Amino acid sequence: MKTPLTEAVSTADSQGRFLSSTELQIAFGRLRQANAGLQAAKALTDNAQSLVNGAAQAVYNKFPYTTQTQGNNFAADQRGKDKCARDIGYYLRIVTYCLVAGGTGPLDEYLIAGIDEINRTFDLSPSWYVEALKYIKANHGLSGDARDEANSYLDYAINALS
């Protein structure tokens, strides 16, 4: 999984050299941010169920057809609602992985790389997940550096889906 730290180490190693002072400064900066990222990941994890439920409701409110259309890819019945919540939870979980890793690697490798194919195959609209992530961003209750860290990865996911 790529992070700024693993990329710096990989580059230095492939060139047979020690980390440069710039690379070391990046590493120290990441260590300072790590605590905020871990706090954000813990808070999002602790509040995951309520955030996912609220995000799903935000999707249903903005896109009412998702609960009115019958079919495997809609939320007209409990099974569909459970699948929607599961998918939103997956996005949130990947964001927490980014917070722990300190980079977008988890989003890039586990989500964004195959999202177009997944959405096409299952007839899913990225706009549903954009709305869900916007809800999570607006309602996670984080502040300060933890908020900034979480929002940076939520924004990254939102932009990738937009």
From Swiss-Prot:
Short name of any one Pfam family annotated for the protein: Phycobilisome
Kinase listed as a keyword: no
* GO CC aspect terms: phycobilisome; plasma membrane-derived thylakoid membrane
Concerning PTM, the database record says: Contains one covalently linked phycocyanobilin chromophore.
Q: Where does (2R,3E)-phycocyanobilin bind?
A: C84
Answer whether the UniProt record assigns the keyword Aminoacyl-tRNA synthetase to this protein.
no
Keyword line = Antenna complex, Bile pigment, Chromophore, Electron transport, Membrane, Photosynthesis, Phycobilisome, Thylakoid, Transport
The record gives the membrane topology as:
Peripheral membrane protein
Task: Please name the Gene3D superfamilies in this protein's record.
Answer: Phycocyanins
Where it sits in the cell: the answer is: Cellular thylakoid membrane
A GO BP entry is: photosynthesis
Q: Which domain of life is it from?
A: Bacteria
Q: How does it assemble?
A: Heterodimer of an alpha and a beta chain, which further assembles into trimers. The trimers assemble into hexamers, although these were not seen in the crystallographic studies. Part of 2 PBS rod complexes, the conventional CpcG-PBS rod and a photosystem I-specific CpcL-PBS rod, both of which include ferredoxin--NADP reductase (petH).
According to its UniProt entry, the function of this protein is described as: Light-harvesting photosynthetic bile pigment-protein from the phycobiliprotein complex (phycobilisome, PBS). Phycocyanin is the major phycobiliprotein in the PBS rod.
Q: Tell me which family the UniProt entry assigns to this protein.
A: Belongs to the phycobiliprotein family.
Q: Identify this protein by name.
A: C-phycocyanin alpha subunit
The organism is Synechocystis sp. (strain ATCC 27184 / PCC 6803 / Kazusa)
